[in-house]
Amino acid sequence: GGIGMCGALAACSGKDSAEDEGTGPLRGTVTMWSSFTQGPRADWMKKMAEEFHAKNPDVTVKIEQFSWSEFNTKWTTGLTSGQVPDISTALPNNVVEMINSEALVPLDKVIDSIGRDRFPKPALAEGQSDGKSYSVPIYSHAQVMWYRKDVLSSKGLSVPKTWEELAKAAKAIGKSDSLYGLSVPLGTGDMLGARYLNFYVRSAGQRLLKDDGTANLTSEAALGGIKYWTDLYKSVSPEGSLDYAVLDQATLFYQGKTAFDFNSGFHISGVATNRSDLVDSIAAAPLPRMKASDPVNYPAEVSNVPLVVWEASKVKREAKAFLEFLFTKDKYIEFLHSVPGGMLPVLNDIAKDPSYTNNETIKKYSDSIKVIQDQVGVGTAIGMEKGPLVQAGVLTSQGLIEKMYHSIIIDKTDVEAAAKDCEKKLNEAFKAAGASIK
């Protein structure tokens, strides 16, 4: 990709490779775009920039902060104008688009230096293309089932292992303004309808994509999932959840208004902040499965949040050195402890390291965190089960699955007809996004 970006300046491709292998002191200004904008994470990143500068006096790391949505606009417009950073945080779906735009440099040497076998293979695969790695995941979180221990015990219910048991338990709890069995979030401005359907389809050993890259919404498992969530929406969910986005949904659990919910370890701090009286009443369990005898920890949804280095950078060697510096053991653990239980180590040895586990929150919720960590080892982003695909971004960014639910619930469209229509729309959107469909 390098030569194409340089046009007539053929010599610059030689400079790139020499720079990658370069020796001598690191020097220059490294601009980093970071979407770690909240308090402790943001403070940590600034501190790392200062510490790296102290170690490498000729290098200054400049941190610029952008929310994830601002970042998305900024890098896509920046690519045309040449206004891109040297290093940045990213999301797996961004990385797919960046690789396709030839905007990134391979980071295999950095990964090997940190220790390739320390990373889960699926996490690295999300940033791989033609055998090269273009992203380095820095933390992970995974979707699991959260529940209220106090509510289950007051109703004499055990923790559901299957989808059928979950539906029965949620219906036994019922719905009232103070407590809902669970909420089924279907807002068209978010991806939760796709997320919940994906759980169900993954538990049946399928994906939301067929092997040829087209959408899978009309298989028996997919139709079963659509009917399942439609039924639970009608029977136990707040009516308004038809328009819920991520925060609306999470807030209900934070406030103690849902008995079951699906989310990551970020739920721990959310409940602690909103309902400190409930901190001993929440726990996580593996996602429900089809049959109780099915494997407990099937691959479902994991978010691996990566860092990338940009092709247009003139300080690639310095940017890579800073990236690697962030994985220094004690510094990396400090980062994870800034949101304990929410940001999980992507390095499997750190997950077991006493200096990581010896944290009040991590000790208190160790059983729940183990459930999440187990899923981190096997799951992927929705639609990326076979590596980086453009389809993954379409599945989660265009609200098509959510609109299908609206059509079933509001317009009373037949489930099979709505699923077939949505499948067709998804396939058209995949092609429009440049997906190569076999």
Task: For every predicted segment, state its role.
Residues L26, V105-K121, L186-G189, A204-G224, ...:
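Short, solvent-exposed loop/beta-turn-alpha elements that line the ligand-binding surface or hinge
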Residues G1-E97, D112-R116, V159, L242, ...:
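Conserved N-terminal structural module of periplasmic/extracytoplasmic solute-binding proteins
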Residues P85-D86, G115-L152, Y180-G181, D294-P299, ...:
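A structural signal for short loop-to-beta-strand junctions that line the ligand-binding cleft
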Residues P92-Q143, S158, L192-Y196, A283-A285, ...:
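Hinge/lid segment of periplasmic solute-binding proteins
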Residues D130, Y134-I138, Q143, E165-A215, ...:
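Extracytoplasmic/periplasmic solute-binding protein
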Residues S153, V376-K438:
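Conserved C-terminal helix/tail region of periplasmic/extracytoplasmic solute-binding proteins
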